Amino acid sequence: MTGGGFATSANGVEFEAKITPIVIISCIMAATGGLMFGYDVGVSGGVTSMPDFLEKFFPVVYRKVVAGADKDSNYCKYDNQGLQLFTSSLYLAGLTATFFASYTTRTLGRRLTMLIAGVFFIIGVALNAGAQDLAMLIAGRILLGCGVGFANQAVPLFLSEIAPTRIRGGLNILFQLNVTIGILFANLVNYGTAKIKGGWGWRLSLGLAGIPALLLTVGALLVTETPNSLVERGRLDEGKAVLRRIRGTDNVEPEFADLLEASRLAKEVKHPFRNLLQRRNRPQLVIAVALQIFQQCTGINAIMFYAPVLFSTLGFGSDASLYSAVVTGAVNVLSTLVSIYSVDKVGRRVLLLEAGVQMFFSQVVIAIILGVKVTDTSTNLSKGFAILVVVMICTYVAAFAWSWGPLGWLIPSETFPLETRSAGQSVTVCVNLLFTFIIAQAFLSMLCHFKFGIFIFFSAWVLIMSVFVMFLLPETKNIPIEEMTERVWKKHWFWARFMDDHNDHEFVNGEKSNGKSNGFDPSTRL
């Protein structure tokens, strides 16, 4: 059933904007890119705690963990650069692929870029599931990383451009919801396959990633391209036809004219990456980069990558480690649903600030428990304290899932102006994957050297990012994208200085630009 409504443009003209089934279905299908990403995040920690997997690819770690060799420290038994590379190589490949994905997103469209991501995922899954040596295993992870780079570039843009303004935040968070569902699915699979003997358990875990890979590929074939992308590539008749379909009305002429004007302004920018560095675009760039760095420095991916390994380090048995990872994965999914409901009601800042307090408290409590109860050679954490650690980790994961998880992607996608949005999204994904790689590659070594202090380290970052949000992050709830300059940046106590009138008339490629697109942007109307 469609929902009716109107969206108001910057010049006061109202455009009819219905929430049509095709929009909802397209957003759901596109968001399956997050399902694949989430499965890759969740599966690595589970298989790296499986004895058969360690024995085949990482015999040194296997001897320390399973055979009982090297009793030096519980915190250090998984400290192995090769093991960390298995996890982190995906994100380094994704970082590289993002540069190519920016080009394909702009020239081939969002839909075809998602299809390319699906193909990379399928080939990578096949190599991982059939891996005979470490080189083949890493090659598969690299191809999966290429898929991540293409999917993370195209999907958030697709969702922002096709979603109606009043539910833009909720629909955009479908991507993050699918990430959390993918993590939970991977944890459940790992819990089941860990009981399979003969070396097939880890192969099944890695091979079942083919399910979300196929969903993304089929979804990319079924969804409609955004009108923004079609007009941008000169396919005007198709763009108008799609606009009618996703609107559920023939009354699209005024809106289509606005879309043409927005596309014209965007095409005048010949060097979008260079334009990102111009003074009027610095606030959006700083916010986007900072959010990606802070998102990773919460420590969430370290926990999601290595949850079973982490629980094993803390003295949990093998089954208990995998089961605890399933519990945290379920909390992750449910809490993301909270974000979908609340992000367009209470706003972005409230969610981020509340979560900062909750994450800081949880990590400090975990650090205290581990500092007192877990030594280098202790074999088991008592049941009461083990439950408390799991509860605190779940409290921490819940806070992240309704704040920094989805909003780290949503806010950059809605704050960049149209003429620099593709480049801005590319920078956003690059920074995110770079710091994801750093954390994934360093976490087990940091755990070995910092011990319980690793949680103090991440809690300090949570404090810093909360202060940043309090003073420097403006609220963007229910504000059309093309009005961000006037209603957000020019009214902010700090960022307004970058929006001075004399900067509004800088020349961009021979044309005057006021740093604000008055044309139509699909993400604010559909």
Swiss-Prot record:
Pfam family, one: Sugar_tr
Record's subcellular location: Cell membrane
Membrane topology according to the record: Multi-pass membrane protein
GO biological process: monosaccharide transmembrane transport; response to abscisic acid; response to salt stress; response to water deprivation
Segments crossing the lipid bilayer: 19-39, 82-102, 112-132, 142-162, 169-189, 204-224, 297-317, 320-340, 350-370, 384-404, 427-447, 452-472
InterPro entries assigned: MFS_dom, MFS_STP/MST-like_plant, MFS_sugar_transport-like, MFS_trans_sf, STP/PLT_plant, Sugar/inositol_transpt, Sugar_transporter_CS
GO MF annotations in UniProt: hexose:proton symporter activity; high-affinity D-glucose:proton symporter activity; monosaccharide transmembrane transporter activity
Keyword Electron transport recorded: no
Entries under CDD domains matching the protein: MFS_STP (cd17361)
Keywords from the named record: Cell membrane, Membrane, Sugar transport, Symport, Transmembrane, Transmembrane helix, Transport
Protein family membership: Belongs to the major facilitator superfamily. Sugar transporter (TC 2.A.1.1) family.
PANTHER family: IP12678P, SOLUTE CARRIER FAMILY 2, FACILITATED GLUCOSE TRANSPORTER
Function (record text): Mediates an active uptake of hexoses, probably by sugar/hydrogen symport.
Protein name per UniProt: Sugar transport protein 13
Gene: STP13
